[in-house]
């Protein structure tokens, strides 16, 4: 399929951001930004060259400008090389949001190795699976995570371990050989760093176009999809992918030097890496670390550091609005607020507009396989049901079950093509063949495109409910329920029914003002009866005291919710 269609007309690209079609990844022809950096390390070097004294990174009381960040990341690269890590080797990162994550990410890129971020919430089994599946040569981890790390991979290969202090008195002792983070940074004298930086810049200027293109397609990061089913798969994000996604954020949002972005979502997740860390490198902005999201801590940090840009899931915005004193805060520097992973309730949009009128809210739809954004809502077009239009180089098509494109307005599976789509999963040709076709990633989402190019997501293919022969898109039910002021989160799932095939069961996480019970359940059903077809009205509603389960991308884990119902049903039967 020729990936020639783009939505550049929605974005009014400047002349400096012209597009051209190029062949990449085994002759796949895609629209590309004609002028672009070669990769992650090049973006950082350009930021240090043109904005050496601009603030680049803030973590508590620690601050780095771009020259200091480049020096520190070069130390990381030299230290890893001293430990036996070579270009192309995989280096895992097992740590939360902290400065070392950013320094390590750029250091790994400087070395030409491949970063493999992992979640600190994973189990020893999950961590071991990723380390072995990617064939990691080294891991940089918080010291309190050392207990999750094997000394060797399953094939007997030793695993180089670098440990960062977590907090005073909290580091668990380890008997495995490891290198302290501070020793990694001291592996080479400062003079040698500056000499090598100069040599690298001269070599980069002399590099042939063919070599630069080959480097573009080299893996930069492997992000494992937490997935909603099955074993995680390692999406191979190349430098080519990273560069185009950061340019999409920069172009569509009007980002520029001096932006100040709070990293509120996990840095190990594709949104944190691409939308915040890498994009701030592309524009010479500043990454402000929030180690753990608490609404009060986020608002305090955003106010103190004059935050201009962030991305969060809708529930995080709702928690901020509920924080006492929110309306009195000086958030006047905040101008861009992105969200994804779930619909933004109308009440949240309205309250943010009232208290922060200078903030442009935007929906960013994408996935690990699309290196973050595939669509973004243009200015002035935010609606409850649409996730935006394709970013400039993206090609989005709606396909039927036979792989044929359907007309505008007709629902089908969302296929996404473009230079930000990863070429494969790491060492998993079977999963690659199932999920990719002709350069397009098959999202598994059911959606529609209208004649203006706006994409609407109706459901996951596997989450659509068949109630007595009628199709119920769970997202439609959830959006309706989110219109109630007490509903913080809602998830509709299909449960087996001997008569109808499936019935509609909804899980609701409600606000704390009042005890949820039969009265609220009836209110919610009446809301659905008013706004939805009768067969879409929930048959049952369960209230949860804690937030609904989500993966690292903020997407609901409906499999876990179904398992809760099946377990409860099994307990009833056995009782």
Where are these regions (language model features)?
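A short N-terminal helical cap/helix-turn-helix that marks the beginning
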Residues: 2-17, 34-56, 71, 571-573
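ANL superfamily adenylate-forming
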Residues: 22, 147-216, 569-570
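Conserved AMP-binding/adenylate-forming core of the ANL superfamily
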Residues: 35-36, 45, 53-98, 102-106, ...
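Conserved AMP-binding A3 loop
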Residues: 65-67, 220-244, 377
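A short helix-loop-beta submotif of the ANL/AMP-binding
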Residues: 90, 96-116, 120-124, 129-138, ...
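AMP-binding/adenylate-forming catalytic core of the ANL superfamily
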Residues: 122, 139-141, 310, 418, ...
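Conserved AMP-binding/adenylation subdomain of ANL enzymes
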Residues: 243-260, 268-308, 323
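Gly/Ser/Thr-rich phosphate-binding loop
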Residues: 307-312, 321-383, 395
């Amino acid at each position: 399929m020729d990936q020639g269609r783009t939505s550049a007309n929605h974005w009014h690209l400047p002349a400096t951001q012209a597009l051209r079609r190029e062949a990449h990844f085994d002759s796949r022809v895609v629209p590309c930004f004609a002028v672009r950096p070669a990769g992650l390390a090049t973006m950082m070097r350009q930021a240090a060259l043109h904005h050496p004294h601009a603030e680049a990174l803030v973590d508590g009381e620690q601050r780095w400008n771009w020259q200091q960040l480049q020096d520190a990341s070069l130390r990381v690269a030299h230290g890893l090389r001293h430990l036996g890590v070579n270009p192309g080797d995989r280096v895992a990162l097992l740590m939360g949001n902290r400065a070392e994550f950013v320094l390590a990410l750029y250091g790994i890129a400087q070395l030409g190795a491949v970063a493999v971020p992992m979640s600190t919430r994973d189990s020893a089994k999950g961590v071991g699976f990723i380390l072995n599946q990617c064939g990691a040569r080294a891991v940089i981890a918080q010291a309190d995570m050392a207990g999750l790390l094997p000394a060797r991979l399953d094939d007997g290969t030793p695993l180089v371990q670098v440990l960062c202090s977590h907090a005073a008195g909290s580091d668990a002792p380890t008997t495995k050989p490891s290198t302290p983070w501070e020793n990694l940074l001291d592996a080479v004298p400062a003079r040698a760093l500056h000499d090598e930086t100069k040599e690298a810049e001269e070599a980069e200027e002399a590099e042939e176009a063919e070599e630069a293109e080959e480097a573009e397609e080299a893996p930069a990061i492997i992000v494992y999809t937490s997935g909603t089913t099955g074993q995680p798969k390692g999406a191979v994000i190349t430098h080519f992918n990273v560069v185009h996604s950061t340019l999409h954020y920069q172009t569509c949002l009007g980002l520029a030097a001096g932006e100040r972005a709070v990293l509120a979502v996990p840095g190990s997740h594709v949104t944190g890496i691409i939308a915040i860390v890498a994009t701030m490198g592309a524009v010479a902005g500043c990454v402000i670390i929030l180690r753990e999201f608490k609404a009060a801590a986020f608002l305090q940090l955003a106010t103190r550091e004059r935050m201009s840009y962030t991305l969060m899931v809708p529930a995080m915005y709702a928690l901020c609005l509920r924080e006492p004193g929110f309306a009195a805060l000086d958030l006047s520097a905040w101008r861009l607020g992105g969200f994804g992973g779930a619909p933004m309730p109308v009440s949240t949009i309205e309250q943010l507009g009232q208290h922060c009128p200078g903030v442009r809210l935007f929906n960013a739809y994408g996935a690990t396989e699309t290196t973050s954004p595939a669509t973004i809502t243009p200015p002035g077009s935010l609606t409850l049901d649409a996730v935006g239009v394709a970013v400039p180089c993206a090609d989005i098509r709606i396909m039927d079950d036979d792989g044929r494109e359907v007309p505008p307005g007709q629902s089908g599976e969302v296929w996404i093509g473009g230079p930000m789509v990863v070429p494969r999963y790491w060492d998993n040709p079977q999963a690659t063949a199932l999920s990719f076709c002709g350069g397009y990633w098959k999202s598994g989402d059911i959606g529609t495109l209208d004649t203006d190019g706006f994409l609407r997501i109706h459901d996951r293919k596997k989450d659509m409910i068949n109630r007595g022969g009628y199709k119920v898109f769970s997202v439609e039910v959830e959006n309706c329920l989110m219109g109630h002021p007490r509903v913080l989160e809602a998830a509709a799932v299909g449960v087996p029914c001997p008569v109808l095939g499936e019935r509609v069961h909804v899980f609701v996480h409600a606000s704390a003002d009042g005890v949820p019970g039969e009265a609220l359940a009836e209110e919610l059903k009446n809301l659905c009866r008013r706004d939805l077809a009768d067969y879409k009205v929930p048959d049952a509603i369960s209230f949860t005291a804690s937030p609904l389960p989500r993966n690292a991308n903020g997407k609901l884990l409906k499999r876990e919710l179904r398992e809760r119902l099946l377990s409860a049903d099994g307990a009833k039967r056995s009782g």
